[in-house]
Amino acid sequence: MAILMLSLQLILLLIPSISHEAHKTSLSSWKHDQDWANVSNMTFSNGKLRVKGIYYRNADICSRHRVTSAGLTLQDLQLWCNLRSVARGQIPSTL
């Protein structure tokens, strides 16, 4: 979920000051060489960012660390987020 929120914050930073009227952006992609997502079919209206056809229903956030290490640091922890995406009108499948 943190990755998704960070992505949305980056998208909002890339959109120049937008009034509360409906606008469409012409963003196509950013930082593709650093695994950032491509952006298409997006609208921003009344403070809401909408992406047609993709909705995130469930997110599982997990963490893992080495059991044998005595003094854990942040570098020893691993955090990942599993997102299940479904198109409009479909039932999400399990991971």
UniProtKB/Swiss-Prot annotation:
The keyword Nucleotidyltransferase appears for this protein: no
Glycosylation sites: N38, N41
One GO molecular-function entry: cytokine activity
GO terms for biological process, alphabetical: cell surface receptor signaling pathway; positive regulation of canonical NF-kappaB signal transduction; positive regulation of extrinsic apoptotic signaling pathway; positive regulation of osteoclast differentiation
Keyword Cytoplasm found: no
Annotated compartments: Secreted
Residue ranges of coiled coil: none
Cellular compartments per GO CC: extracellular space
Keywords: Glycoprotein, Secreted, Signal
Leader peptide range in chain numbering: 1-19
Main location: secreted
Entry protein name: Putative uncharacterized protein UNQ5830/PRO19650/PRO19816
